[in-house]
């Protein structure tokens, strides 16, 4: 049997709601984000999940913990699933960045896609034949999909 990988994004955070670029900051789920995680947990409670893997950032770990609970699973964390590092844009109000020149310290797309590939290889090697739920972030999840497909 092949390894099956399901991707989920963390619930909404305080910074998401305030349009702040989080990047690799920890982030705190807001009430809406907690509700989103609980709703997804309810929807997925009867699905067969063998492993829950999350980014090691708090917002993903907190979401993954809620999703793992009905399955009696512990959350495995990895920095490979961290969000893109936005460098000098981190912590800034997103609408104000529209006309800004991108700083040199933003994680390159090449590095982001490389991390995504490393994550896929890690999952296949570590959890062969398992159903893996991975809780990441918007951009890294898209990178995983781009590399996987």
Show where each model-derived region lies.
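Short beta-strand scaffold positions
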Residues: 54-55, 114, 135-136
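Short aromatic-enriched loop/helix-cap "lid" or pocket-rim segments at secondary-structure transitions
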Residues: 17-20, 64, 87-91, 146-147
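Alpha-helical elements of Rossmann-like donor-binding domains used by nucleotide-donor carbohydrate transfer enzymes
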Residues: 39, 62, 66, 111, ...
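Phosphate-handling substructures
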Residues: 69-121
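Active-site-adjacent alpha-helix immediately C-terminal to a catalytic or transition-state-stabilizing loop
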Residues: 2, 61, 120-149
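Catalytic metal-binding/acid-base residues of hydrolase active sites
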Residues: 12, 58, 81-82, 139
């Amino acid at each position: 049997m092949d390894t099956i990988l399901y991707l989920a994004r963390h619930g909404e955070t305080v910074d998401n709601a305030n349009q702040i670029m989080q990047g690799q900051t920890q982030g705190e789920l807001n009430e809406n984000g907690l509700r989103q995680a609980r709703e997804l947990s309810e929807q997925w409670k009867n699905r067969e999940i063998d492993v829950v893997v999350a980014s090691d950032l708090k917002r993903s770990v907190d979401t993954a913990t809620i999703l793992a609970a009905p399955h009696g699973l512990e959350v495995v964390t990895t920095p490979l699933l961290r969000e893109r590092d936005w460098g000098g844009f981190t912590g800034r109000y997103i609408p104000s960045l529209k006309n800004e020149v991108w700083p040199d310290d933003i994680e390159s797309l090449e590095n982001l896609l490389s991390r995504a590939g490393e994550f896929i290889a890690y999952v296949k090697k570590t959890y062969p034949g398992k159903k893996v739920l991975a809780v990441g972030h918007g951009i890294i999840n898209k990178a995983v999909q781009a590399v996987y497909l």
